[in-house]
A protein has these predicted regions:
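Short helix-perturbing small/polar motifs within transmembrane alpha-helices
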Residues: 1-60, 66-173, 177-219
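Membrane-proximal helical linkers
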Residues: 165-170, 222-240
Length: 240
């Protein structure tokens, strides 16, 4: 019962923080990047449906991350937050036969909004940009690192509270599964940001095939990882 109350309190804190970030982005609303904003909104929503179940953890991972990071790097705070909100909402919709979990969706959307909002503010921080002008990629690396922490720590915390597992052990497991993906997406975002200056807002379309390939690879890898414990148990049972 105690862990249930703590989980409810934590979800409420994350949800309120997410709404505060969304409200703050509205107050700072600037001119919209119409075509770029709409294209990233649609592409990230489509990519959100390409998701894989994380083995051993109650969660999934989709290939929408680079498009959210691109929005954070190139668009306004409001636009980046909306892209993250829609993307996380679409990702939380279960596949056919599944049951929609509104509380889980609220938590996932709020976490993604917070992560995208903080990353966007870092990327557009004048002091950080001027202090790192000799290393142009440093703000992006810092923003992606913070995005990773803000996105994964709350997930690990809520799993720990609901399942009674050790927080650091869960977070370590999530990091082991997702950190290489975040690292790759940081590189992809850097490349696409540079390409956008040359070919325009259509640049993110170029990485759709790459993300599809990454999705297929992770799906295959995670399916094997999920089957390994069951196979080991079967071998152990056969040896007895």
């Amino acid at each position: 019962m105690k862990s249930s109350r703590l989980a409810t309190t934590f979800i409420t804190i994350i949800a309120v923080s997410g709404f505060a970030m969304l409200g703050g982005s509205v107050l700072k609303l600037d001119a919209l990047h119409h075509y770029q904003f709409l294209s990233l909104l649609v592409i990230s929503a489509v990519a959100s449906r390409m998701k894989v179940k994380l083995p051993g953890v109650d969660g999934n991972m989709s290939v929408n991350l680079p498009f959210i990071l691109i929005a954070a790097a190139q668009l306004s705070l409001f636009e980046a937050v909306v892209v993250a909100l829609v993307s996380a909402g679409v990702q939380s919709i279960p596949k056919s036969g599944g049951t929609l979990q509104p509380v889980k969706m609220l938590f996932n959307v709020s976490t993604m909004v917070l992560a995208a909002g903080v990353a966007t503010m870092l990327l557009h921080n004048d002091w950080l940009v001027s202090a790192t002008h000799r290393i142009a990629s440093l703000p992006l690396v810092a923003a992606c690192s913070v995005f990773f922490l803000v996105n994964t720590l709350p997930v690990a915390t809520i799993i720990s509270l609901t399942e009674g597992s050790h927080l650091l052990r869960i977070w370590s497991s999530i990091c082991h599964l997702s950190f290489p993906y975040y690292l790759a997406c940081t590189g992809v975002t850097s490349i696409i940001t540079a390409m956008t200056q040359l070919i325009g807002w259509q640049a993110p379309l170029a990485i759709l095939p790459v993300m599809l390939l990454m999705y297929r690879c992770y799906r295959l890898y995670f399916s094997h990882a999920a089957e390994a414990p069951a196979a080991a148990k079967a071998r152990a049972a056969g040896a007895q």
